[in-house]
Structures are given as structure tokens and as C-alpha cells.
């Protein structure tokens, strides 16, 4: 594939009908592909080598055709937590920060870093990201179509064959950095970890010591929805989302994020702080996040340290 140059050539060489045929084929068959690991060549302050995974053009083409509507709508929407596609120029950065700290009482900024994010990501969470990105296809695709698309995605970017240094290996999992949906899937993963940390924090609170009755009620309903319920209650999901949006405002770009949270609530344990994230990463991501990778900024005027 690499003998002929760039991907543009394939898009020009294949007619739209042929591209559609390949796409339709992936809804009833699995196309296993090869991924090539390359050393990244960049000027960097850090003294370390990074690798990028280049996935096959077939995987990229069909994957983009499947996810395009969802990805385009994420990239085109302004004023939402995931800021992929938002410009930082023309006052965009100022706009994002103002939206982040809006309506949060006693605000504090914090950020963190996922160590070895794309290598340590659990396979089930990468699959969940695929499912979340494909959730809008319930009207146009049958269950079989969607299952085959998921199987394709797993065979192409989750546990595919990797060519590295002239040898072939089976990748045990993790996310491929050259996949068409990498940034979006990482954003879903980021939200998943943040919500997990918040759920754990609120569940770990002593219910008898919560003075705020609305939060005590929220904790009780959260408990029954997590441990007792046999179906998802959309009303409660949106209510908890509103609670997090108000007291734990996030700005997300792939695996990077800034949070503006209510420091009073965090000190009482109603929402997550850095230590809650450390715990979640330790048992849900199998990595230890050191304090040096995190930052907390109590002075809102200074803005985030790094994003």
C-alpha cells in the first residue's frame, strides 16, 4: 500500500460505487488488516521516542464512512465538553474557558494526565467507545450490520496484526494511534473515567453525614440505579448529568482534559478530586498516576496550567 504514496491516491483510484461496495461488504464480513508501527519524527522538548500506528487504508475508509455523521457533529458543535474541532483563535480559547467556569460555585481548576494512555486502555473500554460512537445507527442498520461493523473495528484497530521492525505481532489490545476515530474514542474514554470517579466519590460518602438533602436523595437514587436497577433510567442519567455539569464542568480533547469543580463539594466528597482519579485509574486502567502529572489551580484568573 505504501509503494504508491499517500491515501489521496486510493480515494481517487476507487469510484464512489466501489467505496460503497467495500463499505457494504464490511457489514456482512470481517476484513482483518495489517497495522504498521512507525517511529514518530518530531522536534520535542522531551527526550523520548514515540511510535505511531498506521492502520490500513481499508480500515480507515470504511471506519470513516460508518462514523462520519457522529464525528462531524462532534467536530461542528460548539459549547459542549468535547472541544474537538473548536478553534482556539479569534477568541475561541477565551470562549472555551469562560464556558468552562460559568455557573460553578467556589471554582477550582484541575487537570491530569493518563500515563501510557493508548497502551494501557482496557479493551472493554475501547469497545465501549466504539459502541457509543455508533449509537445513532439504530435506525439505519440492523443488529447484524452493527455487530459486523464492531467485529471489523476490533479486528482492525483493537487486536490486529502489527508489523513492527519487519516482524509480525498480534497486538494484545490498546488503542491504535493512527485509527480514524482515535481522538473521539479517547474522549469517550476520558468521559467514562471522569464519570466513574464521580460515581465512586459520591457512593463512598457517609449518607448520614450529608447535610444537603437533595444530594442525599441523589446518592440514594445513584446507589439504587447502580446496584439494584435492571434497566437504565434516562431521567436519572440526565439529572446526574446536570449535577455534574453544574459542579464538575469539563473541557475534553482526546485524553487531555481540564475540570472546573466546586471545591466545597469536592472537600465533602460529593464529586471527584485528584485522589479519586488516582483510585479509578489504579483499578480500572491498571496504571499509577503520580502527583507530578496532575495540577490544581485555586486562582481562576491564572487559567489552566496545561491543556
Curated annotation (Swiss-Prot):
Residues 1-307 form the Nsp12 RNA-dependent RNA polymerase domain. Residues 107-269 form the RdRp catalytic domain. Residues 175-307 are annotated as: RdRp Palm C-ter. The keyword Cell cycle does not apply. It comes from the Viruses. Residues 77-115 are annotated as: RdRp Palm N-ter. Keywords: Decay of host mRNAs by virus, Eukaryotic host gene expression shutoff by virus, Eukaryotic host translation shutoff by virus, Host gene expression shutoff by virus, Host mRNA suppression by virus, Host-virus interaction, Nucleotide-binding, Nucleotidyltransferase, RNA-binding, RNA-directed RNA polymerase, Transferase, Viral RNA replication. GO terms for biological process: DNA-templated transcription; symbiont-mediated degradation of host mRNA; symbiont-mediated suppression of host gene expression; viral RNA genome replication; viral translational frameshifting. Residues 1-76 are annotated as: RdRp Fingers N-ter. Its EC number is 2.7.7.48. The keyword Transport does not apply. GO terms for molecular function: nucleotide binding; RNA binding; RNA-directed RNA polymerase activity. Residues 116-174 are annotated as: RdRp Fingers C-ter. The active site is at 254, 255, 256. The replicase polyprotein of coronaviruses is a multifunctional protein: it contains the activities necessary for the transcription of negative stranded RNA, leader RNA, subgenomic mRNAs and progeny virion RNA as well as proteinases responsible for the cleavage of the polyprotein into functional products. Belongs to the coronaviruses polyprotein 1ab family. This is Replicase polyprotein 1ab. It comes from Rat coronavirus (strain 681) (RCV-SDAV).
Amino acid at each position: 500500500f505504501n509503494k504508491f504514496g499517500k491515501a489521496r491516491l486510493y480515494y481517487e483510484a476507487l469510484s464512489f460505487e466501489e467505496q460503497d461496495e467495500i463499505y457494504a461488504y464490511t457489514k456482512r464480513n470481517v476484513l482483518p488488516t495489517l497495522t504498521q508501527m512507525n517511529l514518530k519524527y518530531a522536534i520535542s522538548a522531551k527526550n523520548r521516542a514515540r511510535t505511531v500506528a498506521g492502520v490500513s487504508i481499508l480500515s480507515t475508509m470504511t471506519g470513516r464512512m460508518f462514523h462520519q455523521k457522529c464525528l462531524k457533529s462532534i467536530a461542528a458543535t460548539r459549547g459542549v465538553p468535547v472541544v474537538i474541532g473548536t478553534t482556539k483563535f479569534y477568541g475561541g480559547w477565551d470562549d472555551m474557558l469562560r464556558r468552562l467556569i460559568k455557573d460553578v460555585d467556589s471554582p477550582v481548576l484541575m487537570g491530569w494526565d493518563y500515563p501510557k494512555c493508548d497502551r494501557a486502555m482496557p479493551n472493554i473500554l475501547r469497545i465501549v467507545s466504539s459502541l457509543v460512537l455508533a449509537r445513532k445507527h439504530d435506525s439505519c442498520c440492523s443488529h447484524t450490520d452493527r455487530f459486523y461493523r464492531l467485529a471489523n473495528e476490533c479486528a482492525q484497530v483493537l487486536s490486529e496484526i502489527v508489523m513492527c521492525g519487519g516482524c509480525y505481532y498480534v497486538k494484545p489490545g490498546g488503542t491504535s494511534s493512527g485509527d480514524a476515530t482515535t481522538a473521539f474514542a479517547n474522549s469517550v474514554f476520558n468521559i467514562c473515567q471522569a464519570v466513574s470517579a464521580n460515581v465512586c466519590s459520591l457512593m463512598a460518602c457517609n449518607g448520614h453525614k450529608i447535610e444537603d438533602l437533595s444530594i442525599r436523595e441523589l446518592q440514594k437514587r445513584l446507589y439504587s440505579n447502580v446496584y439494584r436497577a435492571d434497566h437504565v433510567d434516562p431521567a436519572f442519567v440526565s439529572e446526574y448529568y446536570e449535577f455534574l455539569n453544574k459542579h464538575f464542568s469539563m473541557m475534553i480533547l482526546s485524553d487531555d482534559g481540564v475540570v472546573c469543580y466546586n471545591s466545597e463539594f469536592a472537600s465533602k466528597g460529593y464529586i471527584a478530586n485528584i485522589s479519586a482519579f488516582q483510585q479509578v485509574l489504579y483499578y480500572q486502567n491498571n496504571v499509577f498516576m503520580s502527583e507530578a502529572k496532575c495540577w490544581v489551580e485555586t486562582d481562576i484568573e491564572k487559567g489552566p496550567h496545561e491543556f
